[in-house]
Amino acid sequence: MMEKRAIIKSLRINYVVSFVAALVVLLAFELGFIEKGLLAKTVSSTTLYVMQVATVLLTVSLIPLAIKGFTSSLEKAKGQPEADILKLFCKRSLQRIFLLFIVVVFSEFVYYALGYEGALYCGVLGYGFMIYCFPTEMVLDQYLADNKE
């Protein structure tokens, strides 16, 4: 069984790597390593529309899934041994980070490569929720305390 501190440390490393990777994509477009509007001229209007809708749908579906899915899965695990709760917390936290990473990177890509301004708002939402989901010992302790009740 991993200790609580080791779990939090591992989750924080994954969180920081995901956040930095999303920032690298952002900087690649901002600094001109990848051309802005790269696909805007080459894709059809139908493809452009599908990408715009996909951006909004990913944001609207994955952010609540990352937030509510995390808490509901841990609520359902009440009464389990502490080792199982720790494993579930680690697994769900990684899934949460990954889902938000998908939202952020896809939104950045659609904003810069296609020029869809709505993707900017989706990306900002994704970054905001990524900051909200920073793994802390306090949250883990709260779930462990709730499990003991």
Regions found by a protein language model. Give the residues of each.
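Alpha-helical transmembrane segments of multi-pass membrane proteins
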Residues: 22-33, 66-67, 131
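Alpha-helical transmembrane segments
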Residues: 45-62
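Short, amphipathic, aromatic/basic-enriched membrane-interface segments that mark the entry/exit
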Residues: 85-96
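Alpha-helical transmembrane segments and their membrane-interface junctions
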Residues: 100-122
